[in-house]
């Protein structure tokens, strides 16, 4: 799953994760979880922040609709700390990985 830091200031950064629907049906509900050692996620755009901090859970926002088969969706988050590659990625209950 592609990840990149899009903004960085002293003690604060914003990251972007691109979610791709690799199934043959629209994806109307999803959950992304990951750990972020050395950072505290505080806000999210493009999803609902269920659990903040260094152990993060983000769910789809019902108002954004579904992701079509083969389609992508961007989730952006703001965090305090030092940016790095998040770990322990799980999407829809399955292990995934982040790529820079």
Identify what each model region corresponds to.
Residues 19-23:
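Asparagine-centered strand-capping/turn motif at beta-strand->loop junctions
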């Amino acid at each position: 799953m592609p990840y990149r830091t899009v903004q960085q200031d002293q003690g604060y950064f914003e990251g972007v994760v691109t979610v791709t629907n690799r199934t043959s049906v629209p994806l109307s509900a999803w959950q992304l979880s990951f750990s972020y050692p050395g950072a505290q996620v505080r806000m999210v755009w493009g999803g609902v922040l269920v659990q903040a901090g260094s152990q993060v859970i983000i769910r789809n926002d019902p108002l954004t609709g579904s992701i079509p088969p083969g389609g992508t969706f961007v989730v952006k988050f703001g965090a305090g700390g030092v940016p790095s590659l998040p770990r322990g990625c799980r999407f829809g209950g399955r292990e995934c990985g982040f790529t820079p």
